[in-house]
């Protein structure tokens, strides 16, 4: 207090505009009142420790590790930082520094995770009483976090099976403060490189004479590119900032701004594969269009046959159950209400079914009467559906058989047309026939004459052939060469009989093939009927199971899905 009792110096007062620095310079200075820097908040800060230079400390620790004395390195690091405040409870070293000392102290410069834990407990006094499982969860988690976070540590697979991996110091890590692994979105170097490449590409295209960003027709890129025409003096027109030709805002899209699309084709930034850019308009003739329409219609009819059958019936297995969530629980009511429900199915009138049903409520028992009636209705509807399916399949089978019979009749009609050359009724009377010349001419072929006569034609003209044979026999008997005539007639008859037998065999084979085809079609139809019946049985069983599981005992009000 004696210092404050001294008189303060009297400053000379002057009005001649002296500077403040000159006035302050005349004041006595004291070592304890040196000017201090102020923070950005313009308040005098409390004295705080100076920031620790982590780069120097890491270099010192790395040098001590290179000398091979981790304990001395820890002591030197603590001595260098004795004037600063402690960063952690055990000292100024971080978890990464402790792990580095632990790995560097090993003989082979590698440790497992459990060995790092043991080194911490043995060498750091703070962790000596925290080695048990209850108190070590926190700092062990921090060690694992730092091992996976820093680039200076690398993980090496252990040679033995079932053993933990080795942790070693990464020799390729940068010296000084270790760089933390960042996410891909935080690394801006790649983004800057990509952005620079885009700028260079756009500038090269612009220098080559490619213009078309801001033409008369606006492009759906962005409001910035659209405003460049209205503000030609904008700095965006300068060469320092160029928009990409395919630039588009995130909010806009081609779907939302299709009316504002520019007809100008985008710049050829994609590789050219040699294909023409504008494809010609291919037009089909009317005949091709009709053929395609018929083909599409037949395919659509075949695909939608089953669905149309179900729609015509007006009843499906899935539509027979309510799909709405159950309402909240209500107290049970003893009187039951009987309500008529109409099922639009074949063979069922709207008033022919009367059931007792209610939606599924929790904490309620199923009603046997309502279950039985509802299941009976569903079974009857399923049976009607099966009967309709069988009828439709029978109709299809009959149509197929009718078509096959029509084809067979047409073939028979074609084969049964009599050949005019062999029809003797068409010849007029009074004709003369030189039988001797005819027999002589036929015998000259040495039995190689082949006459193909259809079976129907032979059947219709059998009497005529027999008459002609008799006439030839009589004429030959009257002639001098009766023996030769009889032998030739017998040869002709034998040939005709052989041909008739061959034709009969061929027709029998054709009939057998047709019968086999009909049997195969019947087997396929029967298999389809069995599959449909099995599917209907399973569907009805599933419906019965679902009905028994969801129906309640007490009826309070009709379900909302019934109309």
UniProtKB/Swiss-Prot annotation:
The keyword Cytoplasm applies. GO terms for molecular function: DNA-binding transcription factor activity; DNA-binding transcription factor activity, RNA polymerase II-specific; RNA polymerase II cis-regulatory region sequence-specific DNA binding. The modification Phosphothreonine is found at residue 43. The keyword ATP-binding does not apply. Residues 1-72, 177-243, 317-371 are annotated as: Disordered. SMART domains: FH. Interacts with melt. This is Forkhead box protein O. It comes from Drosophila mojavensis. The gene is foxo.
């Amino acid at each position: 207090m004696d210092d404050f009792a001294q008189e303060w110096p009297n400053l000379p007062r002057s009005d001649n505009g002296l500077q403040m620095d000159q006035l302050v310079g005349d004041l006595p200075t004291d070592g304890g009142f040196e000017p201090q820097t102020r923070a950005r908040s313009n308040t005098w800060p409390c004295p705080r420790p100076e920031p620790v230079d982590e780069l120097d400390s890491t270099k010192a620790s790395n040098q001590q590790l290179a000398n091979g004395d981790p304990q001395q390195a820890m002591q030197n690091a603590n001595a260098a930082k004795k004037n600063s405040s402690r960063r952690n409870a055990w000292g100024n070293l971080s978890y990464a520094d402790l792990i580095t000392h632990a790995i560097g102290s090993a003989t082979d410069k590698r440790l497992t995770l459990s060995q790092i834990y043991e080194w911490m407990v043995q060498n750091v006094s703070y962790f000596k009483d925290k080695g048990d499982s209850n108190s070590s969860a926190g700092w062990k988690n921090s060690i694992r976090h730092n091992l996976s976070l820093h680039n200076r540590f690398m993980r090496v697979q252990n040679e033995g099976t079932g053993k933990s991996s080795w942790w070693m110091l990464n020799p390729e890590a940068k010296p000084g403060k270790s760089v933390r692994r960042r996410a891909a979105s935080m690394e801006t170097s790649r983004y800057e490189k990509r952005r620079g490449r885009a700028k260079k590409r756009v500038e090269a295209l612009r220098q080559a004479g490619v213009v078309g960003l801001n033409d008369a027709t606006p492009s759906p890129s962005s409001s910035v590119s659209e405003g460049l025409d209205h503000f030609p003096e904008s700095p965006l027109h300068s060469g320092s900032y160029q928009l990409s030709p395919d630039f588009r805002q995130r909010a806009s899209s081609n779907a939302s701004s299709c009316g504002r699309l520019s007809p100008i084709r985008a710049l050829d930034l994609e590789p050219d594969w040699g294909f023409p850019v504008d494809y010609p308009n291919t037009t089909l003739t009317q005949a091709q269009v009709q053929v395609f329409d018929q083909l599409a219609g037949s395919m659509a009819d075949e695909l939608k046959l089953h669905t149309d059958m179900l729609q015509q019936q007006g009843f499906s297995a899935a539509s027979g159950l309510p799909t709405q969530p159950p309402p909240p629980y209500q107290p049970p009511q003893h009187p039951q209400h009987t309500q008529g429900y109409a099922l639009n199915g074949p063979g069922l009138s709207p008033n022919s079914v009367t059931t007792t049903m209610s939606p599924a409520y929790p904490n309620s028992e199923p009603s046997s009467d309502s279950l039985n009636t509802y299941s009976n209705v569903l079974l009857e509807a399923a049976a009607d559906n099966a009967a309709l399916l069988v009828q439709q399949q029978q109709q299809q089978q009959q149509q197929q058989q009718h078509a096959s019979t029509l084809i067979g009749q047409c073939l028979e009609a074609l084969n049964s047309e009599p050949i005019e050359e062999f029809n003797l009724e068409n010849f007029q009377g009074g004709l003369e026939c030189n039988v001797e010349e005819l027999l002589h001419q036929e015998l000259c072929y040495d039995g190689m004459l082949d006459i193909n006569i259809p079976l129907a034609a032979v059947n219709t003209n059998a009497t005529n052939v027999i008459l002609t044979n008799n006439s030839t026999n009589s004429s030959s008997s009257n002639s001098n060469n009766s023996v030769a005539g009889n032998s030739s007639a017998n040869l002709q008859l034998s040939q005709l009989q052989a041909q008739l037998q061959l034709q009969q065999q061929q027709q029998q084979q054709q009939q057998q093939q047709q019968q086999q085809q009909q049997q195969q079609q019947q087997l396929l139809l029967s298999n389809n009927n069995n599959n449909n019946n099995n599917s209907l049985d399973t569907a009805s069983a599933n419906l019965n199971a679902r009905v028994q599981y969801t129906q309640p005992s007490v009826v309070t009000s009709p379900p909302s899905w019934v109309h």
